Amino acid sequence: MGNIRRSRGYNYEHALVQKLNSSGSWRARRLGGSSTGLPDIVAVNNDDGVLLTIEAKSGASDILYVPQDQIERCLVIRNMFAIYPKRHIILAFKFMGKKRFRRKNETVYESRKLLEYYKVADALSSMKVLPIIIKCTYDGRTYAIYKRKTVSLDLPEYLMPFQKSAVQVSIPQETM
């Protein structure tokens, strides 16, 4: 199962890099696996002075998580490149077209709409205490998880250079 998750993550990161590199003045690079201590992707637009540090998550469940150490990596790179007037931390979430869950000790997959969200997480840099985990749900809501509590975290959508408009999704409560 671990290899499937790793390859799914790599494929998502690779696809994001390709989309960014095909978007005019943007240049993006995948920086390697989690053991590198770097964000998944760094993208720059030198013409407009924009730097994006991107942490990408993909999965077949209803919730995707970004741990604190991965947020810290994005903050370090974002702060290192102060020459860029516009620097953003982007949390990219891709919810696969099939939902995975357990039923009677079996793994079952159910078709659903594939959704992607790009959340601006710049507000995290001003927090005195970083959340242990950032959580994103299938409907695009984000939460900060601290030691003893979960709080709503309204991270705004980021319009990626390859998007025509930000994703606005309405999901009936019965599917959640």
Question: Model features per residue range: what roles?
Answer:
Residues 20, 41-43, 49-60:
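Conserved catalytic cores of phosphodiester-cleaving nucleases, focusing on short active-site segments
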Residues 3-7, 88-176:
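Domain-level recognition of nuclease-like catalytic cores that cleave nucleotide substrates
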Residues 1-32, 83:
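Acidic-basic catalytic patches of nuclease active cores, encompassing PD-(D/E)XK
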Residues 33, 46-47:
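Short polar/acidic secondary-structure junctions
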Residues 64-91, 98, 103, 113:
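Short, charged, amphipathic alpha-helix that recurs within catalytic cores of restriction-modification
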Residues 2-3, 58-63:
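Surface-exposed cleft-lining segments at the edges of enzyme active sites
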Residues 30, 55, 91-93:
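Structural signal for conserved beta-strand scaffold positions within catalytic alpha/beta enzyme cores
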Residues 35-38:
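Short acidic/glycine-enriched loop/turn segments that link adjacent beta-strands
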